[in-house]
A protein has these predicted regions:
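Nucleotide-sugar donor-binding catalytic core of glycosyltransferases
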Residues: 1-2, 6-7, 14-19, 37-48, ...
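Ordered hydrophobic segments in well-structured contexts
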Residues: 10-12, 211
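Active-site proximal beta-strand in glycosyltransferases
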Residues: 12-15, 23-39
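Surface-exposed flexible segments
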Residues: 27, 32, 117, 168-171, ...
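Conserved acidic donor-binding segment of nucleotide-sugar-dependent glycosyltransferases
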Residues: 205-209
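Conserved small/polar residues in nucleotide/adenosyl-binding loops
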Residues: 210-216
């Protein structure tokens, strides 16, 4: 989303992914807020040049922010984390009616998916919910699907084959926050980094499932 220039004042715009065709937006009055900085470290010099005219650059990932600082980037960067609107806030009194045991939503981590498949073989009564396109057609429908589910599987993107797509960066995505706001118990797989520390993943799912073993009972 690009916000139009207003009287020469700084303009914030969202850039979903840092890209090599940024040059046309390299204007000093624009402040990019970059969501996915999946830049190959070997090409870092090119992106320093592409973004050099911006007086301020925001990045959503604390992992990326600390990485760029460690590389002595010349860019004036700040960390501005992704979050959810206060209207999704829950309290200890929030209670959603749960219809399904586990939800599978979005891109699945292959290790967690295999773990679930193996568990299902020994626990055939486990209900697994895969929402339809129609159920996910709106944001309300998307969140309602998670609110119906007791357990959700979550993994950061840069592991288990995702490294190629993200160049090894593995930030926490908004889906984790949406699962929390939907009252799901989360089984998570992630590598600890500045981003997982920032969002305090260990408080929600203290074990990163590096070596999965099948429990006798899935606590749902």
């Amino acid at each position: 989303m690009l916000m139009l220039k207003n009287g020469g004042k700084p303009v914030l715009f969202f850039e979903m992914k840092a890209n090599a065709f940024h040059l046309w937006k390299n204007l000093n009055y624009l402040i990019p807020w970059i969501i996915d900085w999946y830049v190959n470290p070997n090409n870092q010099w090119w992106y320093n040049w592409l973004y050099k005219r911006h007086k301020l650059i925001l990045v959503s990932s604390k992992e990326v922010y600390e990485y760029l600082l460690a590389k002595n980037t010349r860019l004036n960067i700040r960390h501005l984390a992704l979050s959810l609107s206060d209207r999704y806030k829950i309290t200890s009194n929030t209670c959603y009616e749960k219809k399904y045991d586990v939800i599978l939503i979005g891109r699945q981590n292959p290790v967690l998916k295999d773990f679930l498949d193996q568990y299902k073989k020994t626990h055939p009564d486990l209900t697994i919910f895969i929402p339809s396109k129609q159920e996910l057609a709106s944001r309300d429908g998307y969140l309602d699907s998670m609110k119906k589910s007791r357990v959700a599987l979550y993994a950061t993107p840069g592991i288990d084959g995702g490294e190629k797509r993200t160049n090894g960066f593995s930030q926490v995505t908004p889906r984790f926050l949406e699962m929390v706001a939907s009252g799901c118990n989360i089984i998570a797989r992630y590598k600890t980094n500045a981003d997982t520390d920032y969002y305090e993943l260990e408080k929600f799912c203290p074990v990163s499932y590096t070596h999965l073993t099948l429990p006798t009972k899935l606590e749902v």
